[in-house]
C-alpha cells in the first residue's frame, strides 16, 4: 500500500508539473487521479467489488466531462498558456461531440446500475441521472456561450455532490454484506 501511495503522490506531482499540458493525457489523468483512491481500497482489502467498480466508472466519466467543459470554458487561457487540451487540438465542435458521447455513456450506466445491482433508494439518483444527462447533451448542442459552460460545470459539480450524498441511501443490507465480505480475513 505504501508503494501505491508513493506512486500516487508522484503521479500528482507529474500531472501538476508536466502532464496537464499534454493532449489527452492531462484530461484522462485528471479524472483518473480523482477516482484512483478507490483502487487503494481494493489493494488494501484484496477484494474487487463490481458495484464499486461501476460507481468508479460512472464517477470517472462524470469527472472527465467536467474537465472537458472546464477546458472549453478556459479555451483562450489554455491557448495563451501553451496547453494542448482536447478542445485546442481537436477543436470546439469535436470536443462537444465527445462530451455528448460521454453523456450518452453516463446515461447508459445510469440505466444499467439500478437494473444490475440492488441499490435501494440510491437507485433514484441514477434514474434521475438519465434526464439530467439528456438535458446536458441538448444544452451542449444548443448553447455555445461561456455562460452556458459555467452553468454546466456548476450543474455537474452539484450532481457529483448529490451522487456522493446518495450513497447514504444505498441499501444498508447490501452494505452490511459488502462489509462482511471485505473485512473478513
Model-found features: residue ranges?
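Multi-pass alpha-helical membrane architecture of UbiA-family
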Residues: 1-185
Amino acid at each position: 500500500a505504501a508503494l501505491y501511495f508513493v506512486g500516487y503522490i508522484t503521479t500528482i506531482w507529474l500531472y501538476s508539473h508536466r502532464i496537464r499540458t499534454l493532449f489527452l493525457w492531462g484530461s484522462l489523468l485528471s479524472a483518473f487521479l480523482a477516482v484512483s483512491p478507490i483502487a487503494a481500497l481494493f489493494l488494501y482489502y484484496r477484494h474487487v467489488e463490481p458495484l464499486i467498480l461501476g460507481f468508479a466508472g460512472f464517477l470517472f466519466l462524470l469527472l472527465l466531462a467536467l474537465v472537458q467543459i472546464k477546458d472549453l470554458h478556459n479555451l483562450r487561457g489554455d491557448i495563451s498558456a501553451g496547453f494542448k487540451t482536447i478542445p485546442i487540438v481537436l477543436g470546439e465542435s469535436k470536443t462537444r461531440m465527445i462530451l455528448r458521447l460521454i453523456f450518452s455513456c453516463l446515461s447508459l450506466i445510469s440505466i444499467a446500475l439500478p437494473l444490475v445491482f440492488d441499490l435501494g433508494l440510491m437507485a433514484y439518483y441514477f434514474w434521475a441521472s438519465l434526464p439530467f444527462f439528456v438535458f446536458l447533451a441538448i444544452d451542449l448542442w444548443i448553447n455555445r456561450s461561456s455562460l452556458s459552460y459555467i452553468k454546466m460545470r456548476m450543474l455537474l459539480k452539484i450532481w457529483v455532490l448529490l451522487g456522493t450524498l446518495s450513497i447514504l441511501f444505498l441499501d444498508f443490507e447490501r452494505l452490511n454484506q459488502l462489509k462482511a465480505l471485505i473485512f473478513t480475513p
